[in-house]
Amino acid sequence: MYSLELSLRYSPFPIAIQKKEFEDVKRIYEEIKNSMNEPLETSNLVELRCDKVQDKLIAVRAQEIISVQIYEKSSVAGGAKRPGFSLDID
């Protein structure tokens, strides 16, 4: 299972969906990246559907997305910190 995580402007919580195939999540990643590069006047609505939770649908304006990432969701719970944009300050 692959996770696609979005960080939104002015939101402390990321939005994530899961896809079974890497090709699916990579295609969505590229679509979002292209939408983020478009001018503000033509900002698209990005609609996402999750494979893990069938009824989970997300729609967000591309101009509100500040980062997007893909990571593989491991079935092994090793106690490590979650992947992503976390900052570890000691």
Swiss-Prot record:
NCBIfam families: PRK13683.1 (NF010236). Belongs to the UPF0367 family. This is UPF0367 protein PMT9312_0127. It comes from Prochlorococcus marinus (strain MIT 9312).
